Curated annotation (Swiss-Prot):
Gene: MYB39
SMART domains: SANT (SM00717)
Keyword tags: DNA-binding, Nucleus, Repeat
Lineage: Eukaryota, Viridiplantae, Streptophyta, Embryophyta, Tracheophyta
Organism, as annotated: Arabidopsis thaliana (Mouse-ear cress)
GO biological process: positive regulation of DNA-templated transcription; regulation of phenylpropanoid metabolic process; suberin biosynthetic process
Protein known as: Transcription factor MYB39
Annotated region (Disordered), positions in chain: 299-324
PANTHER family: F14D16.11-RELATED (PTHR47994:SF5)
Intrachain S-S bonds: none
Domain of life from the UniProt record: Eukaryota
Length: 360
């Protein structure tokens, strides 16, 4: 259980600051008789104080051998060494420092020594390097700004590249954390910054042979130029736009793929009326076909009257939304008609790999 405080037994004792007269009585009694038993000393010395208050006043202020003033470097090193061995046993630590009291050492440790160890990155409890110390990392932005101002990066484009700044900042953070966690030397990150700021172009790897790294070859100059002299750029001008493809079919201007009546044409073309009936046939001519970037012209030899079903097949915007099976059936029926020798047959033959005009 321990002893109860002496002040609980002494009711009505004086508390608070000591007066000079009380200091003189305590000093005179101890110099003449010694302190002896601190519980009985106040009555013997004629003081209205408790024994604990008399002891603390003598040990911390009235002793003749007490040392006052700033702690020396030798005393600080002794305190750190003894604290690592003994912990917070201030009375035992004070026994190794003549003239210093345990209360004075404790106050000095809490106000000065503890903060100094934290600034040095040392845990004041275990006296080992701190692994959760973030203070070296907090000044990375200042270090980065100073490096940029001093021109250490040697690249003014870094200021306009937020991604490079973020990457360098991450490298700085990782480097600091590794320095704190691992005691071994960490490689300098200047090489990382050099590779980051001056990246080398990546070569093109041949997909057929992964062991060889070759630049991408340019295609032959005349590969995509046909005999008629039409280049891919010129042929692209002849390709119709899918948005306004029906605007060019004005009054019997449909190419000669099939023979169409004006009634069927009016039915297929959006925005026209089906009441007008014209029996004139559309002229036959050359049907332009495209293979890649090449413009090919094939004469239309067959003629077939187009029904609304096939007309809707040629113009998707007017066709009703049907299932995939209906579409395939209509397409097969269309291919089985008299168009085996037409432009579509030629176009299908051109798309086959065996009859491709372009050598691969």
């Amino acid at each position: 259980m321990g002893r109860s405080p002496c002040c609980d037994q002494d009711k009505g004792v004086k508390k608070g600051p000591w007066l000079p007269e009380e200091d003189d009585k305590l000093t005179a009694y101890i110099n003449e008789n010694g302190y002896g038993n601190w519980r009985s000393l106040p009555k013997l010395a004629g003081l209205n104080r408790c024994g604990k208050s008399c002891r603390l006043r003598w040990m911390n202020y009235l002793r003749p051998d007490i040392r006052r003033g700033k702690f020396s470097d030798g005393e600080e090193s002794t305190i750190v060494r003894l604290h690592a061995l003994l912990g917070n046993k201030w009375s035992k630590i004070a026994g190794h420092l003549p003239g210093r009291t345990d209360n004075e050492i404790k106050n000095y440790w809490n106000t000065h020594m503890r903060k100094k160890l934290l600034q040095m990155g040392i845990d004041p409890v275990t006296h080992e390097p701190r692994t959760n110390d973030l203070s070296p990392i907090l000044d990375v932005s200042q270090m980065l700004a100073a490096a940029i101002n001093n021109g250490q990066f040697g690249n003014n484009n870094l200021l306009n590249n937020n991604t490079a700044l973020e990457d360098i900042l991450k490298l700085q953070l990782i480097h600091k954390m590794l320095q704190i966690i691992t005691p071994k030397a960490i490689p300098n990150i200047s090489s990382f910054k050099t590779n980051l700021l001056n990246p080398k172009p990546e070569p093109v790897v041949n997909s057929f042979n992964t062991n060889s790294v070759n630049p991408k070859p340019d295609p032959p100059a005349g590969l995509f130029i046909n005999q008629s002299g039409i280049t891919p750029e010129a042929a692209s001008d002849f390709i119709p736009s899918y948005e306004n493809v029906w605007d060019g079919f004005e009054d019997n201007q449909l190419p000669g793929l099939v023979t169409v009546s004006q009634e069927s044409l009016n039915t297929a073309k959006p925005g026209t009326s089906t009441t007008t009936k014209v029996n004139d046939h559309i002229r036959t001519g050359m049907m332009p076909c495209y293979y890649g970037d090449q413009l090919l012209e094939t004469p239309s030899t067959g003629s077939v009257s187009v029904s609304p079903e096939t007309t809707s097949l040629n113009h998707p915007s007017t066709a009703q939304h049907s299932s995939g099976s209906d579409f395939l059936e209509d397409w097969e029926k269309f291919l089985d008609d008299e168009t085996s020798d037409s432009c579509w047959k030629s176009f299908l033959d051109l798309t086959s790999p065996t009859s491709s005009p372009v050598p691969w």
